[in-house]
From Swiss-Prot:
Sugar attachment sites: N65, N81, N92, N167
Family affiliation: Belongs to the glycosyltransferase 15 family.
Catalytic site: E313 (nucleophile)
Positions of region (Catalytic): 90-425
Residue ranges crossing the lipid bilayer per the database entry: 14-33
The keyword Thylakoid is annotated on this UniProt entry: no
Function: Involved in N-linked glycosylation. Transfers an alpha-D-mannosyl residue from GDP-mannose into lipid-linked oligosaccharide, forming an alpha-(1->2)-D-mannosyl-D-mannose linkage.
Source species: Saccharomyces cerevisiae (strain ATCC 204508 / S288c) (Baker's yeast)
Name of the protein described by the UniProt record: Probable mannosyltransferase KTR2
EC number: 2.4.1.-
Length: 425
């Protein structure tokens, strides 16, 4: 009897220990379930990440074996003596920046962005222009930031300063009037010098004589995406003379008499300069509605105010050096509108390109993401943004392309843009 009691006691203890073990095991299992799920999710997302990245391996690794400049940013973790391969062949081109000494930080930000996204793979020259001598700090900092050669030039006074034939009384009155109207840069004398210089003198600088193409860069801009190609090469191979990324409406208060001067020029000029059958004149003169939500901006002249935003432009210097462009500029310049009003280089370049070039000599670089305050542009194709590692959202309010103030749809219809819009009733 005593033996039975001992046996039952041992069985009870064993059952209790077993139940306790089961409870502990169940508790541990329940605690581990979220962790196991997390491991499963981590494994899934890791696998998907590898699938996406491997899809773009060629794009991501296409520049791993580039030969890079020793004295500057290499953008490469490997020692230079381990790099192998052949440099990308460069075109006869330069990156061009009109900049002042005090804008150094903004210049470096723009340079870093463009070097990261494009020039680290080509090492194009950087050319800097200023109306006063560059200081040593500016030269040293920009030289260190560039992957290619840097060069600096002082703009001659006769190319920059206000011409002597401008009536000073009328000029001062114009400054005061525009300042009272709160027109952007309406009271600035130096801004007018800059617009006139960029319209008719930048391409005459001796430092640019050796080059065929230029890429205009301004301080404090950003390039959102890796460049999928060399735009200079695209320009040369496809016989393009002018390239842009953003097009929008101009402020009419800055150019009230510009179109009148253009019309006078058209009446007086030789017809050989202009071919209305093949040019993009409709881009700057057409007022037709495009779609239900994209109308037109009111204008008091025959100019619809569309222009290419020239803070990003890639151009053929030989077009600007041509007699037909110089004749056009000098005629406009003789009217004094750069000073009595506030004509910008953007509408001047845009009207000139639309009149004097064939529409298929102008290219819209729609794969290039770009930001100049307050507007930007971002490629609309999702997989293109992935492939080019873009840091932008095509649906962001800052993306001007589908904004009502954008002229991109006008370019699609009246330039060398979208075929379906040209034939849409």
């Amino acid at each position: 009897m005593q033996i039975c009691k001992v046996f039952l006691t041992q069985v009870k203890k064993l059952l209790f220990v077993s139940l306790l073990f089961c409870l502990i095991a169940q508790t541990c299992w329940l605690a581990l379930v979220p962790y196991q799920r997390q491991l499963s999710l981590d494994s899934y997302f890791f696998r998907r990440s590898r699938e996406v990245s491997s899809r773009y391996d060629f794009t991501r690794r296409r520049h791993m074996n580039q030969t890079l400049k020793l004295s500057s940013n290499t953008y490469n973790d490997e020692p230079l003596n381990k790099t192998k391969g052949i440099k990308n062949q460069r075109e006869n081109a330069t990156l061009l920046m009109l900049v002042r000494n005090w804008e150094l930080s903004g210049a470096l930000r723009s340079m870093r962005s463009l070097e990261d996204r494009f020039n680290k793979n080509y090492q194009y020259d950087w050319t800097f222009l200023n109306d006063v001598p560059f200081d040593q700090e500016f030269i040293e900092a920009t030289t260190a930031m560039a992957s290619g050669r840097t060069q600096y030039a002082l703009i001659p006074a006769e190319d920059w300063n206000r011409p002597s034939w401008i009536n000073e009384t009328l000029f001062e009155e114009a400054l005061q009037l525009m300042e009272e109207k709160n027109i952007l840069y309406g009271g600035s004398k130096s801004y007018r010098n800059m617009c006139r210089f960029n319209s008719g003198f930048f391409f005459r600088q001796k430092i640019l004589d050796p080059y065929d193409f230029y890429f205009r860069v301004e301080p404090d801009v950003e390039y959102f995406c890796d460049f999928p190609y060399d735009p200079f090469k695209v320009m040369r191979q496809n016989n393009k003379k002018y390239g842009f990324v953003i097009t929008m409406y101009e402020y009419e208060d800055t150019i009230p008499s510009l179109w009148e001067a253009v019309e006078e020029y058209l009446e007086e000029t030789e017809s050989a300069d202009i071919d209305m059958e093949s040019n993009a004149f409709g881009f700057v003169s057409n007022f037709d509605f495009i779609g239900k939500s994209f109308g037109v901006i009111d204008s008091n002249s025959g100019y619809n105010l569309c222009h290419f935003w020239t803070n990003f432009e890639i151009g053929d210097l030989n077009f600007f050096r041509s007699e037909k462009y110089i004749r056009f500029f000098e005629y406009l310049d003789s009217k004094g509108g750069f000073y009595y009003e506030r004509w910008g280089d953007a509408p001047v370049h845009s009207i000139a390109a639309s009149l004097l070039l064939k529409k298929d000599e102008i290219i819209h670089f729609d794969e290039l993401g770009y930001k100049h305050m307050p507007f930007g542009t971002c490629p609309s194709a999702y997989y293109l943004r992935l492939q080019q590692r873009c840091l932008c959202d095509s649906n962001h309010p800052d993306n001007i392309d589908l904004n009502v103030i954008s002229c991109l749809r006008r370019w699609w219809k009246d330039g060398s843009g979208k075929y379906f819009l040209k034939h849409d009733s």
